[in-house]
Amino acid sequence: MTELKNDRYLRALLKEPVDCTPVWMMRQAGRYLPEYKATRAQAGDFMSLCKNAELASEVTLQPLRRFPLDAAILFSDILTIPDAMGLGLRFSTGEGPIFDNPITCKADVEKIGVPDPEGELQYVMNAVRQIRKDLNGDVPLIGFSGSPWTLATYMVEGGSSKAFTKIKKMMYAEPQTLHLLLDKLADSVIEYLNAQIKAGAQSVMVFDTWGGVLTPRDYNLFSLQYMHKIVDGLIRENDGRRVPVTLFTKNGGMWLEQIAATGCDAVGLDWTINIADAKARVGDKVALQGNMDPSMLYASHDRIREEVASILEGFGHGGTGHVFNLGHGIHLDVPPENAGVFVEAVHELSKPYHQ
């Protein structure tokens, strides 16, 4: 594989010295960029874009042409696994993802198998291979998956949810059915992420978007234990380099110690936690990724720089191990120039912390 020209992101995840704090943005390839909208229109619809390796690579690289980002993230969706399990995924305008065949009972869970990453999900691996080729070693490529709990919420609810009543009903009335589903999903995620690593992903991230809706006990039982299983099952070295893994639970600030104890390399933070507190709690064990509120990108350029400075100061001088990011995905109507101000501010204002 091509030599990596910028490995700042990988080094920070492994708490190795860097010249400045690396930065990337969740959903950096997306609807806030006019060029993304043009490519998506060319593809026809969202899943067609995901399934076309050349176009998926094009949208992955678009933000890198605009901003000096330190990593690229695979353009895909967390729902590729349940889609490959035959749940009939479609995207409805204004409603988000819908599954025509949701999971409603134990028999539904027993019917589904672990998808073959080089079979039903080969289009994802083709995209990874294409992106690595097109990146030409400029920056590392991040692969990703949803967490078992988060995938299960969509599969049982039949789409997005605000109250999570269907999955919580299953969790409390039929816990064994839900555990069976989560176990299959954990096995699927392990195979899926390992295939991404073999195809060229140099780091992987697990998005636990909905872990924060659980009680502390249920978080450990129904979300964290399955992410722990994934961390244990991942390829951690490839191409002569460590493959770092980041776990991110949105609204997971109360569980940082438990997340750090899984053996992951980094913990993603949302904006509801102070990064100085997070560092004091788990900074000796793991790197931290985050954690500016994505809505801050609506602010003036000066205010964005001020917020970046404040988060950098919060992480402080004590060693490396910070990957700057937003606390969740960038909003679709953020002015692209504000994202540029953010990225450049991170590089410029972080240099004194790394001397």
UniProtKB/Swiss-Prot annotation:
Pathway: Porphyrin-containing compound metabolism; protoporphyrin-IX biosynthesis; coproporphyrinogen-III from 5-aminolevulinate: step 4/4. GO terms for cellular component: cytosol. Transmembrane segments: none annotated. Keywords: Cytoplasm, Decarboxylase, Lyase, Porphyrin biosynthesis. The keyword Cytoplasm applies. Its main location: cytoplasm. GO terms for molecular function: uroporphyrinogen decarboxylase activity. InterPro entries: UROD/MetE-like_sf, Uroporphyrinogen_deCO2ase_HemE, Uroporphyrinogen_deCOase. Belongs to the uroporphyrinogen decarboxylase family. This is Uroporphyrinogen decarboxylase. It comes from Vibrio vulnificus (strain YJ016). The gene is hemE.
